């Protein structure tokens, strides 16, 4: 789960991380009133969307008067902001964060992530802050600093000292950086975060370190422990089909293709998407119904797939282990009769009760195309939509 910048800063401040502060606006009629509450020489108006690249896309504006800030805020509120992360459709700006500006002497990058390849928490830092860190890693990888934390021992003093040293901090600034490292680590662990990113972390004119922008992504599997964080969820920033799927206990990610996929198991789902590409089409979604899906969940999964107007055909690929193939077959038939599937539907079943499942499908009287293996299924669905 993602949250907005102003929410991320609120959490970080609770853990002792110094951040820039401001006021959030959620209604156009509150813009002037909110800006009047800020007494500053420089105003920073920031669009609040769940995507990076806001600055380059015009979603962050620095102005030097109240009237100019009000005009910029009114112009920005409600627009569709297109960044390199939103896609061409953009993301509607429903919230603004208005801050007091500050002098910046130097910008840094600092983040903490769970590194799945190394099976540990990793700090990533760079003296090149305020820019796309992926570009820095590609062009000047020597400027990327990494410190891994052994899960058996946790954060140690040498991690904090090392990060401060590698970033070139000394004396009081080194002490500040060590405290920030510790605070961010504690926030990461205690909130079940998947990533905390501060970009940029700045040194201001007073020589103090300050988080000027912040992003936090949470592990969805840990949200049940944090109702206060779950309450921060902004459904307007999420795909409505993905929200609907999550409420039904389904793992669904919308994609840009034309073949809808319903599969059980994340690995099998990715293999199914790969083979669809191999045979010349593109997957419209990732959808894992899980190992314990029942008839109603299968029915809802197909409804969600068909809610995507770009879907021209559906490939169902089920390996029946915990999931019985006859249950899948009954769900497919129920959905087909209920909503009327008007696109080609290819079904490949294997595993528990496969013969019974295939018999149910063949006796249904519906135009369901059976497949014997994954390659056969991919070939048939691609041919069916041509």
Curated annotation (Swiss-Prot):
<dbReference type="InterPro" id="IPR013815">
    <property type="entry name" value="ATP_grasp_subdomain_1"/>
</dbReference>
<feature type="binding site">
    <location>
        <position position="46"/>
    </location>
    <ligand>
        <name>ATP</name>
    </ligand>
</feature>
<dbReference type="InterPro" id="IPR013650">
    <property type="entry name" value="ATP-grasp_succ-CoA_synth-type"/>
</dbReference>
<keyword id="KW-0816">Tricarboxylic acid cycle</keyword>
<dbReference type="GO" id="GO:0004775">
    <property type="term" value="F:succinate-CoA ligase (ADP-forming) activity"/>
</dbReference>
<dbReference type="GO" id="GO:0004776">
    <property type="term" value="F:succinate-CoA ligase (GDP-forming) activity"/>
</dbReference>
<comment type="pathway">
    <text>Carbohydrate metabolism; tricarboxylic acid cycle; succinate from succinyl-CoA (ligase route): step 1/1.</text>
</comment>
<dbReference type="InterPro" id="IPR005811">
    <property type="entry name" value="SUCC_ACL_C"/>
</dbReference>
<dbReference type="InterPro" id="IPR011761">
    <property type="entry name" value="ATP-grasp"/>
</dbReference>
<feature type="binding site">
    <location>
        <position position="264"/>
    </location>
    <ligand>
        <name>substrate</name>
    </ligand>
</feature>
<feature type="binding site">
    <location>
        <position position="199"/>
    </location>
    <ligand>
        <name>Mg(2+)</name>
    </ligand>
</feature>
<feature type="binding site">
    <location>
        <position position="213"/>
    </location>
    <ligand>
        <name>Mg(2+)</name>
    </ligand>
</feature>
<feature type="binding site">
    <location>
        <begin position="53"/>
        <end position="55"/>
    </location>
    <ligand>
        <name>ATP</name>
    </ligand>
</feature>
<comment type="similarity">
    <text>Belongs to the succinate/malate CoA ligase beta subunit family.</text>
</comment>
<dbReference type="GO" id="GO:0006104">
    <property type="term" value="P:succinyl-CoA metabolic process"/>
</dbReference>
<dbReference type="InterPro" id="IPR005809">
    <property type="entry name" value="Succ_CoA_ligase-like_bsu"/>
</dbReference>
<keyword id="KW-0547">Nucleotide-binding</keyword>
<dbReference type="GO" id="GO:0005829">
    <property type="term" value="C:cytosol"/>
</dbReference>
<keyword id="KW-0067">ATP-binding</keyword>
<dbReference type="GO" id="GO:0005524">
    <property type="term" value="F:ATP binding"/>
</dbReference>
<dbReference type="GO" id="GO:0006099">
    <property type="term" value="P:tricarboxylic acid cycle"/>
</dbReference>
<protein>
    <recommendedName>
        <fullName>Succinate--CoA ligase [ADP-forming] subunit beta</fullName>
        <ecNumber>6.2.1.5</ecNumber>
    </recommendedName>
</protein>
<comment type="function">
    <text>Succinyl-CoA synthetase functions in the citric acid cycle (TCA), coupling the hydrolysis of succinyl-CoA to the synthesis of either ATP or GTP and thus represents the only step of substrate-level phosphorylation in the TCA. The beta subunit provides nucleotide specificity of the enzyme and binds the substrate succinate, while the binding sites for coenzyme A and phosphate are found in the alpha subunit.</text>
</comment>
<dbReference type="GO" id="GO:0000287">
    <property type="term" value="F:magnesium ion binding"/>
</dbReference>
<dbReference type="Pfam" id="PF08442">
    <property type="entry name" value="ATP-grasp_2"/>
</dbReference>
<keyword id="KW-0436">Ligase</keyword>
<feature type="binding site">
    <location>
        <position position="107"/>
    </location>
    <ligand>
        <name>ATP</name>
    </ligand>
</feature>
<keyword id="KW-0460">Magnesium</keyword>
<feature type="binding site">
    <location>
        <position position="102"/>
    </location>
    <ligand>
        <name>ATP</name>
    </ligand>
</feature>
<feature type="binding site">
    <location>
        <begin position="321"/>
        <end position="323"/>
    </location>
    <ligand>
        <name>substrate</name>
    </ligand>
</feature>
<dbReference type="InterPro" id="IPR017866">
    <property type="entry name" value="Succ-CoA_synthase_bsu_CS"/>
</dbReference>
<feature type="domain" description="ATP-grasp">
    <location>
        <begin position="9"/>
        <end position="244"/>
    </location>
</feature>
<dbReference type="GO" id="GO:0042709">
    <property type="term" value="C:succinate-CoA ligase complex"/>
</dbReference>
<dbReference type="Pfam" id="PF00549">
    <property type="entry name" value="Ligase_CoA"/>
</dbReference>
<dbReference type="InterPro" id="IPR016102">
    <property type="entry name" value="Succinyl-CoA_synth-like"/>
</dbReference>
<comment type="subunit">
    <text>Heterotetramer of two alpha and two beta subunits.</text>
</comment>
<feature type="binding site">
    <location>
        <position position="99"/>
    </location>
    <ligand>
        <name>ATP</name>
    </ligand>
</feature>
<keyword id="KW-0479">Metal-binding</keyword>
């Amino acid at each position: 789960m993602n949250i907005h910048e102003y929410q991320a800063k609120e959490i970080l401040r609770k853990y002792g991380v110094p951040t820039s502060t401001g006021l959030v606006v959620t209604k156009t009629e509150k813009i002037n009133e909110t800006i009047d509450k800020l007494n500053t020489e420089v105003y920073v108006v920031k669009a609040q969307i769940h995507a990076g690249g806001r600055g380059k896309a015009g979603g962050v504006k620095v102005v030097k008067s109240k009237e100019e800030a009000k005009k910029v805020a009114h112009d920005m509120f409600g627009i569709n902001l297109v960044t390199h992360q939103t896609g061409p459709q953009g993301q509607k700006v429903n919230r603004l964060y208005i801050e007091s500006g500050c002098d910046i002497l130097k910008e840094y990058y600092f983040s903490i992530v769970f590194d799945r390849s190394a099976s540990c928490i990793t700090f990533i830092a760079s003296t090149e802050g305020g820019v796309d860190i992926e570009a820095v890693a590609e062009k000047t990888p020597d400027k990327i600093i990494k410190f891994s934390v052994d899960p058996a021992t946790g954060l140690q003093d040498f991690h904090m000292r090392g990060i401060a040293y590698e970033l070139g901090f000394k004396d009081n600034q080194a002490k500040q950086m060590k405290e920030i490292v510790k605070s961010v680590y504690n926030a990461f662990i205690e909130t079940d975060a998947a990533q905390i990113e501060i970009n940029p972390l700045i040194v201001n004119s007073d020589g103090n370190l300050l988080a000027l922008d912040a992003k936090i992504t949470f592990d969805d599997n840990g949200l049940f422990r944090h109702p206060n964080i779950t309450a921060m969820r902004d459904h307007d920033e999420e795909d409505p089909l993905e929200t609907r799927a999550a409420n039904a206990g389904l793992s669904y990610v919308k994609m840009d293709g034309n073949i809808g996929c319903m599969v059980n198991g994340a690995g099998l789902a990715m293999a199914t998407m790969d083979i669809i590409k191999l045979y010349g089409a593109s997957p419209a979604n990732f959808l894992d119904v899980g190992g314990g899906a029942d008839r109603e969940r299968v029915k809802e999964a197909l409804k969600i797939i068909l809610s995507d107007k770009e879907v021209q055909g559906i490939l169902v690929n089920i390996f029946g282990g915990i999931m019985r193939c006859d249950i899948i077959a009954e769900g497919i038939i129920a959905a087909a009769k209920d909503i009327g599937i008007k696109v080609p539907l290819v079904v490949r079943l294997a595993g528990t009760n496969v013969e019974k499942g295939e018999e149910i499908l063949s006796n249904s009287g519906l135009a369901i195309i059976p497949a014997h293996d994954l390659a056969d299924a991919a070939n048939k669905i691609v041919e069916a939509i041509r």
